[in-house]
Regions:
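C-terminal domain-boundary segment and adjacent tail
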Residues: 74-149
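Active-site-adjacent pocket scaffolds in enzyme catalytic domains
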Residues: 1-96, 146
């Protein structure tokens, strides 16, 4: 995230954002004013009220299925589903509470065999006890658990 972007998000009262990819399962408060100097320990800035929601390229359909100049794409949908389910299982084993964000683009996931995989995936997560919610609701749940002081 660009330095000015954080200022603008805070200035315009954004509640959450999800571009930093700082954690796979735990939301956290975005810091402002970190100091990074060569050959020196990092100095952390102050936490802001802005909540960073977890997101990861490994839980995004685009890198797995679409061809780019650096990736072949067209992975087997079932192997992607297996990885995504295992990510959820790992989260439930290793955290007391967490959020896992799966990013699905209509033009990527919306192909026949991938839609069938998505149906199986949602059913499997339901069987494993997943709660499905919008990102703004998940951010509010985090905020209730970890109020900004």
């Amino acid at each position: 995230m660009l330095f000015r972007s954080l200022e603008l998000l805070i200035q315009h009262d954004f509640y959450y954002e999800s571009s930093m990819m700082g954690h796979d399962y735990s939301p956290y408060r975005v810091r402002q004013g970190d100091v990074i100097e060569l050959q020196m320990p990092m100095q952390f800035g102050d936490k802001t009220r802005l909540i960073e929601m977890p997101i990861s390229w490994s839980q995004d359909d685009h890198p797995h299925f679409e061809m780019t100049s650096t990736r072949p794409g067209h992975r087997n949908a079932n192997s992607v589903m297996e990885n995504w389910v295992d990510d959820f299982i790992y989260m439930t084993r290793c955290t007391d509470w967490g959020i896992i964000t799966y990013t699905c683009h209509p033009y990527v996931i919306g192909r026949g065999h991938r839609m069938l995989m998505l149906e199986r995936f949602i059913t499997k997560l339901q069987e494993l006890g997943a709660d499905f919610m919008r990102m703004d609701h998940a951010a509010r749940v985090y905020d209730e658990r970890h109020p900004y002081l």
